[in-house]
């Protein structure tokens, strides 16, 4: 199967899988308490996937590419001049490692700061409304969806970049990693929007935009890459960088928007009696379970 066919099939599978997993909370009628529990579970999934799946996968993608390149270079060097170039190789290897450490931190921070700026810009536009609290809540919903869409788009770029390497194993690993967190993210997004009181039709639109983001961007990335840019892309470890950037956006959405909203602390600072009690024991268990599920799945995926 050629690269274009495989990327098309992977994109279609991503779209369907993401949309179906997001529809589940809409298809089942939950009571108020069960909806809160599902939302808490979704928040746990968002946090767990950011920390246990996306960041490790991004770091792994970075180091895998550099280690493969080093292994290839060493093979070439042994064939040509083993003794003369040994010192140069070790220096280049150390330089690569220092670059990688910088990539990890910079990518994560840029993703987080990007979402922080998007959040602030969205909030400043909303503050002119008559009811600032309602405006803040609306901004929270938009920012949550936008953050996950940006995250999904970065995932799409990662998959497109992986497809351009013409290595089927790399494509499948990136696809599995993306689906591992896209399905829970779609579930988490929809349950959060339901908890926030959005109409079902609008939730479906939000979900569709989120589901489309990664497949569309993966196709565009793959089609937009020429041979020369493919080579340049492999040099700067684009797959790993894109995944780490998306992890930064994901962490912001999970920790700054979804968790406070679920915990009753939200952006609202009104002295609300219901909000002050926080999470019940069952909800805390659901939150911890949500955090642990991606961890267990990622351990299974690594083996």
Swiss-Prot record:
<feature type="transmembrane region" description="Helical">
    <location>
        <begin position="35"/>
        <end position="55"/>
    </location>
</feature>
<keyword id="KW-0472">Membrane</keyword>
<dbReference type="GO" id="GO:0071577">
    <property type="term" value="P:zinc ion transmembrane transport"/>
</dbReference>
<dbReference type="GO" id="GO:0005385">
    <property type="term" value="F:zinc ion transmembrane transporter activity"/>
</dbReference>
<dbReference type="Pfam" id="PF02535">
    <property type="entry name" value="Zip"/>
</dbReference>
<feature type="glycosylation site" description="N-linked (GlcNAc...) asparagine">
    <location>
        <position position="237"/>
    </location>
</feature>
<keyword id="KW-0406">Ion transport</keyword>
<protein>
    <recommendedName>
        <fullName>Zinc transporter ZIP9-A</fullName>
    </recommendedName>
</protein>
<keyword id="KW-0963">Cytoplasm</keyword>
<keyword id="KW-0539">Nucleus</keyword>
<dbReference type="InterPro" id="IPR003689">
    <property type="entry name" value="ZIP"/>
</dbReference>
<comment type="similarity">
    <text>Belongs to the ZIP transporter (TC 2.A.5) family.</text>
</comment>
<keyword id="KW-0864">Zinc transport</keyword>
<feature type="transmembrane region" description="Helical">
    <location>
        <begin position="240"/>
        <end position="260"/>
    </location>
</feature>
<keyword id="KW-0812">Transmembrane</keyword>
<dbReference type="GO" id="GO:1905562">
    <property type="term" value="P:regulation of vascular endothelial cell proliferation"/>
</dbReference>
<feature type="transmembrane region" description="Helical">
    <location>
        <begin position="282"/>
        <end position="302"/>
    </location>
</feature>
<dbReference type="GO" id="GO:2000654">
    <property type="term" value="P:regulation of cellular response to testosterone stimulus"/>
</dbReference>
<keyword id="KW-1133">Transmembrane helix</keyword>
<dbReference type="GO" id="GO:0005739">
    <property type="term" value="C:mitochondrion"/>
</dbReference>
<feature type="glycosylation site" description="N-linked (GlcNAc...) asparagine">
    <location>
        <position position="29"/>
    </location>
</feature>
<comment type="function">
    <text>Transports zinc ions across cell and organelle membranes into the cytoplasm and regulates intracellular zinc homeostasis. Participates in the zinc ions efflux out of the secretory compartments. Regulates intracellular zinc level, resulting in the enhancement of AKT1 and MAPK3/MAPK1 (Erk1/2) phosphorylation in response to the BCR activation. Also functions as a membrane androgen receptor that mediates, through a G protein, the non-classical androgen signaling pathway, characterized by the activation of MAPK3/MAPK1 (Erk1/2) and transcription factors CREB1 or ATF1.</text>
</comment>
<dbReference type="GO" id="GO:0005802">
    <property type="term" value="C:trans-Golgi network"/>
</dbReference>
<dbReference type="GO" id="GO:0005886">
    <property type="term" value="C:plasma membrane"/>
</dbReference>
<keyword id="KW-0496">Mitochondrion</keyword>
<feature type="transmembrane region" description="Helical">
    <location>
        <begin position="7"/>
        <end position="27"/>
    </location>
</feature>
<feature type="transmembrane region" description="Helical">
    <location>
        <begin position="102"/>
        <end position="122"/>
    </location>
</feature>
<dbReference type="GO" id="GO:0031966">
    <property type="term" value="C:mitochondrial membrane"/>
</dbReference>
<keyword id="KW-0813">Transport</keyword>
<dbReference type="InterPro" id="IPR045891">
    <property type="entry name" value="ZIP9"/>
</dbReference>
<feature type="transmembrane region" description="Helical">
    <location>
        <begin position="142"/>
        <end position="162"/>
    </location>
</feature>
<feature type="transmembrane region" description="Helical">
    <location>
        <begin position="206"/>
        <end position="226"/>
    </location>
</feature>
<dbReference type="GO" id="GO:0070830">
    <property type="term" value="P:bicellular tight junction assembly"/>
</dbReference>
<dbReference type="GO" id="GO:0048471">
    <property type="term" value="C:perinuclear region of cytoplasm"/>
</dbReference>
<keyword id="KW-0325">Glycoprotein</keyword>
<dbReference type="GO" id="GO:0004930">
    <property type="term" value="F:G protein-coupled receptor activity"/>
</dbReference>
<feature type="transmembrane region" description="Helical">
    <location>
        <begin position="172"/>
        <end position="192"/>
    </location>
</feature>
<dbReference type="GO" id="GO:0022883">
    <property type="term" value="F:zinc efflux transmembrane transporter activity"/>
</dbReference>
<dbReference type="GO" id="GO:0006882">
    <property type="term" value="P:intracellular zinc ion homeostasis"/>
</dbReference>
<dbReference type="GO" id="GO:0005497">
    <property type="term" value="F:androgen binding"/>
</dbReference>
<dbReference type="GO" id="GO:0005634">
    <property type="term" value="C:nucleus"/>
</dbReference>
<keyword id="KW-1003">Cell membrane</keyword>
